[in-house]
From Swiss-Prot:
GO terms for cellular component: cytoplasm; extracellular space. The keyword Disulfide bond applies. Involved in gametogenesis and steroidogenesis. Residues 1-18 form the signal peptide. Disulfide bonds join 26-74, 40-89, 51-105, 55-107, 110-117. This is Gonadotropin subunit beta-1. Glycans are attached at residue 30.
Length: 130
């Protein structure tokens, strides 16, 4: 019995350290964005990085109307923008598509000034058949 206790005491810090990664797994992930330009008559798939994962959160049992409640979500901390230019577009067509590329991520309150804070669709979208 004493040996089990010693092993548990030795392993407990290691388990707690490995568990911290499980509690907050907000990190960069590779994604593909399908973009269609009807004006240019083309459809492309762009590979980029985004933020995805779980953030530690808790919900109060009692909800007070005086206290605002929010959940932390996995958001871009730093990002840049890249552009793609559609080829073979008619004159005056909008041939430039600009998209964000995540450089780092963080668990934070969603900032609706720069982010769509709604629920993401799990459905993969493709180009429309014309």
């Amino acid at each position: 019995m004493r040996m089990r206790f010693v092993v548990m005491v030795i392993l407990l810090p290691a388990l707690m350290m490995s568990g911290s990664e499980c509690r907050s797994s907000c990190r960069l992930t590779n994604i593909s964005i399908t973009v269609e330009s009807e004006e240019c008559g083309s459809c492309i798939t762009i590979d980029t990085t985004a933020c995805a994962g779980l953030c530690k959160t808790q919900e109060s049992v009692y909800r007070s109307p005086l206290m605002l409640s929010y959940q932390n979500t996995c958001n871009f901390r730093e990002w840049t923008y890249e552009t793609y230019e559609f080829k073979g577009c008619p004159a005056r067509a909008d041939s430039i598509f600009t998209y964000p590329v995540a450089l780092s991520c963080e668990c934070s309150k969603c900032n609706s000034d720069i982010t769509d804070c709604g629920v993401l669709s799990q459905q993969t979208l493709g180009c429309n058949a014309h």
